[in-house]
A protein has these predicted regions:
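Active-site microenvironment of metallo-dependent hydrolases
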Residues: 1-160
Length: 160
């Protein structure tokens, strides 16, 4: 097993990682309240990946560089992490799975954050369903919070 942060390595190395059949996308972030300004910089604002990691990945490696197909990229963001962490019923759309679904307006998928203002939500995520409940409708949060902490099931064949 291996992990990589795209801020630590050269772009060529990152591309090699993402092209590998087992290379997957993950986000190391924290929970933030977007209505509150922190007191001491740089902790006052979260990093840009807190709001825009996945649109950034999709735009950069699928749209712009054509490193991956959309299908490959989606798998690296969904099914592969669910498999790696043994999250049953997650990462695929099939009978018996949780209804976690994202509908993207591909032409209008954009990061809206800037280095000075990182707390801007992306556009182009038209609908997001978590456990079958709409949490985003037409790029706006519905107020619903059906998510929960996911705990991996032990995998007897894993070394971690």
């Amino acid at each position: 097993r291996c992990s990589i942060g795209d801020y630590r390595f050269t772009e060529d190395y990152v591309k090699l990682f993402y092209k590998h059949p087992r290379g997957m996308v993950g986000v190391d972030s924290s929970m933030v309240d977007d209505r509150v300004e922190g007191v001491y910089p740089p902790w006052g604002r979260p990093g840009p990946n807190t709001y825009s990691a996945y649109p950034s990945f999709l735009n950069r490696y699928v749209k712009e560089q054509r490193l991956l197909t959309l299908e490959e990229a989606v798998r690296k963001c969904t099914a592969l992490p669910a498999e790696a962490y043994n999250l049953e019923g997650r990462g695929t759309i099939e009978v018996g799975s949780y209804a976690d679904i994202l509908l993207i307006d591909w032409e209008n998928l954009r990061m809206n954050s800037t280095p000075r203002e990182t707390r801007r939500y992306p556009t182009g995520f038209v609908y997001v369903f978590v456990n079958g409940v709409a949490v985003i409708e037409k790029d706006r949060h519905t107020g619903a919070r059906p998510g929960r902490v996911l705990r991996r099931k032990p995998d007897p064949t894993s070394s971690i």
